[in-house]
Amino acid sequence: MTQDEMKKAAGWAALEYVEKDSIVGVGTGSTVNHFIDALATMKADIDGAVSSSEASTEKMKALGIPVYDLNSVDELSVYVDGADEINAHMDMIKGGGAALTREKIVAAVADKFICIVDNTKEVDVLGEFPLPVEVIPMARSYVARQLVKLGGDPVYREGVVTDNGNVILDVYNMKIMNPKELEEQINAIVGVVTNGLFAMRGADVLLVGSPEGVKTVK
């Protein structure tokens, strides 16, 4: 199986967790795009979706899936999203697509977080993938200096503006042994909107696409 076929298998497997007549939280990225294709096959059975990015919103609307503003929704039974890295404790690094803040907000609302990945995303220790940090533009240099003090090597992601109008610093060379602690430390830096560690709110179910099929971890 190609990597994309493994992503597709994980994306379609997530349909099992979608409840009839519910509003579904939908993330962002290449694996999620396969889930959106799958979700479109049962659009008549759901009330609609809440999206974590403009890109996912556009794709769902094009497929005829109603998309709601999160502020108009009281509850979400599930949130389905991918990850750039995930460890055995269901802690993740996300934000390669720069949608981390909205992803984190939708994940916080949802009762259950279903993470869909291919098997290249499973790691023992987080940090080989650079950790994205969304930053208010005027604070970029200050935040970068603080991230260096935490042992990281921040690099400004040129030409990228988030859906919220902010910038991204990608932090390299961090072996993240305590994801929850680091998530809190970085979020406490003035000027940081949020960072791509999803440890305080990790995944509840992991669906891993592999050449052998889809593995489920709970």
From Swiss-Prot:
Active site: 103 (proton acceptor)
Function: Catalyzes the reversible conversion of ribose-5-phosphate to ribulose 5-phosphate.
Record bears the keyword Isomerase: yes
Reactions the enzyme catalyzes: aldehydo-D-ribose 5-phosphate = D-ribulose 5-phosphate
Subunit structure: Homodimer.
GO BP terms in the entry: D-ribose metabolic process; pentose-phosphate shunt, non-oxidative branch
Family of the protein in this entry: Belongs to the ribose 5-phosphate isomerase family.
Protein's UniProt keywords contain Isomerase: yes
Xref: InterPro entries: NagB/RpiA_transferase-like, Ribose5P_isomerase_typA_subgr, Ribose5P_isomerase_type_A
Listed name of the protein: Ribose-5-phosphate isomerase A
EC code(s) of this entry: 5.3.1.6
UniProt binding sites for substrate: 28-31, 81-84, 94-97, 121
Pathway annotation: Carbohydrate degradation; pentose phosphate pathway; D-ribose 5-phosphate from D-ribulose 5-phosphate (non-oxidative stage): step 1/1
Species assigned in the record: Shewanella sediminis (strain HAW-EB3)
Keywords of this entry: Isomerase
GO molecular function: ribose-5-phosphate isomerase activity
NCBIfam families: PRK00702.1, rpiA
GO cellular component, one term: cytosol
Residues that span the membrane, as ranges: none
